């Protein structure tokens, strides 16, 4: 490959070479053609739907199935706005998506004199549904911004990231981009927090686990933890499949039922892992659960810890790593009450829905 590339080609080359991107979703056009120009040389597959909304949902689905960030390559203006719904969906469901969209040439940014597909401020348009959204007028900032995006995807709560790149910047010549290596680690709770949490778990007589989408990569750790404390596990919609439906402690997606909610509120300990406890999970008229006992909340997003409830202990950390550390720190229980409770809830759900 030549030492000099168009910026658009250099972006794809960097994503392929350093971040393992092998597929992108979008529709090529005159505005973003430089991003497509070098796809074949990088071995990256381009999948083009009929509409950018489809590209966004494909990228979102890609992240669900592969565990990798979905990448959208879009044109400015309507290309981006067509994809707003899947971007918002990925934001709501905490899934990684990189949106690279062309935008108005640098000399026309914010001028509003009518260039094709102009928006007053493209980056601002999507900022509220992205971890960050930037307009990139200096091509040399791109490696740092792409690294920053991957740090969001891998060490924070995953969320979409949008980079708006003016057409003239995409067309500039540059040397191949080199990866900017930065230290990024998922947060780990303090030893004192683990100690207090372990004390609460060891003292509990009927612990319950509510697991959300933050557990999607922590199924094995969740199972071991639940088995160690004999706790029934209620799954939110975003956590379906995290724990096998055949596991005796799996109560399934039954949080919508009033009886289950009342049992949870009466428990002496509820451990909430990686979930917002949102209206969509509860379907109870927008009311938060009124926990009668202690609450332990585990989430990679610190802001989530005090939303909808005030926990007795809040642990900021990755679900899998935190559950593993707790499993090693607690006393293993030998009762079967948790299995019986999970069975009771499963039977209640079947009776309410008429499921076989």
Where are these regions (language model features)?
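Short gly/pro/ser/thr-enriched loop/turn and capping motifs at secondary-structure boundaries
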Residues: 53-56, 80-81, 104-109, 170, ...
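Anionic-ligand anchoring segments at beta-strand to alpha-helix junctions in alpha/beta enzyme folds, i.e.
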Residues: 22-60, 73, 102, 189, ...
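Active-site diphosphate/adenylate-binding microenvironment
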Residues: 8-13, 18, 27-30, 35-40, ...
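Structural signature of the thiamine diphosphate
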Residues: 22-23, 64-101, 127-178, 200, ...
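Short glycine/serine/threonine-rich phosphate/pyrophosphate-binding segments
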Residues: 32-34, 54-58, 78-87, 91, ...
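Aromatic-enriched
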Residues: 167-192, 337-338, 349, 353-354
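Phosphate/pyrophosphate-binding active-site segments
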Residues: 1-3, 140, 292, 296-356
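Glycine-rich beta-alpha junction loops
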Residues: 28-31, 104-105, 165-171, 213-215, ...
């Amino acid at each position: 490959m030549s030492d000099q590339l168009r910026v658009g080609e250099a972006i794809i080359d960097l994503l392929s070479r350093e971040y393992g991107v092998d597929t992108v979703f979008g529709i090529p056009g005159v505005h973003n053609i430089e991003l497509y120009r070098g796809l074949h040389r990088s071995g990256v597959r381009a999948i083009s739907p009929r509409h950018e909304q489809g590209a966004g949902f494909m990228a979102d689905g890609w992240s669900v199935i592969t565990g990798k960030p979905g990448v959208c390559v879009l044109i400015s203006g309507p290309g981006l706005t067509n994809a707003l719904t899947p971007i918002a969906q990925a934001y709501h469901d905490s899934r990684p998506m990189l949106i690279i969209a062309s935008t108005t040439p640098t000399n026309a940014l914010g001028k509003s004199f009518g260039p094709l597909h102009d928006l007053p401020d493209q980056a601002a348009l999507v900022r509220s549904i992205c971890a960050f959204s930037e307009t990139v007028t200096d091509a040399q900032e791109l490696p740092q911004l792409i690294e920053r995006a991957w740090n969001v995807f891998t060490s924070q709560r995953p969320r979409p990231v949008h980079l708006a790149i003016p057409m003239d910047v995409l067309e500039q010549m540059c040397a191949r981009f080199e990866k900017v290596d930065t230290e990024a680690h998922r947060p780990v709770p303090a030893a004192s927090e683990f100690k207090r949490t372990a004390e609460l778990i060891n003292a509990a007589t009927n612990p319950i686990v509510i697991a959300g989408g933050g557990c999607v990569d922590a199924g094995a750790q969740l199972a071991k933890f639940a088995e160690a404390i004999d706790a029934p596990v209620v799954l939110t919609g975003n956590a379906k499949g995290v724990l096998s439906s055949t596991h005796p402690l799996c109560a399934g997606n039954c949080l919508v039922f009033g009886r289950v909610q009342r049992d949870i509120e009466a428990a002496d300990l509820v451990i909430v892992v990686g979930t917002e406890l949102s209206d969509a999970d509860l379907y109870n008229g927008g009311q938060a659960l009124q926990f009668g006992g202690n609450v332990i909340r585990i989430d990679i997003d610190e802001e989530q810890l005090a939303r909808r409830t005030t926990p007795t202990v809040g642990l900021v950390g990755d679900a899998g790593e935190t559950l593993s550390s707790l499993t090693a720190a607690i006393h293993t229980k030998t009762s079967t009450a948790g299995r019986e409770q999970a069975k009771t809830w499963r039977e209640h759900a079947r009776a309410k829905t008429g499921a076989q």
